Amino acid sequence: MITDVQLAIFANMLGVSLFLLVVLYHYVAVNNPKKQE
């Protein structure tokens, strides 16, 4: 079974990784002058 601590750690890791993906994508999209739509 999954305990509360394991679930909390999994949720935190998922949230942090998604947040970092969004920040990384924003950084790449802003600093890419080749792709002007």
Swiss-Prot record:
UniProt name for this protein: Dolichyl-diphosphooligosaccharide--protein glycosyltransferase subunit 4
UniProt entry tagged with the keyword Membrane: yes
Species per Swiss-Prot/TrEMBL record: Homo sapiens
Name of the gene: OST4
Family in the record: Belongs to the OST4 family.
All ranges on the Lumenal side of the membrane: 1-4
GO cellular component entries: endoplasmic reticulum membrane; oligosaccharyltransferase complex; oligosaccharyltransferase complex A; oligosaccharyltransferase complex B
Compartments where located: Endoplasmic reticulum; Endoplasmic reticulum membrane
InterPro entries hit by this protein: Oligosaccaryltransferase, OST4, Ost4p_sf
GO BP: protein N-linked glycosylation; protein N-linked glycosylation via asparagine
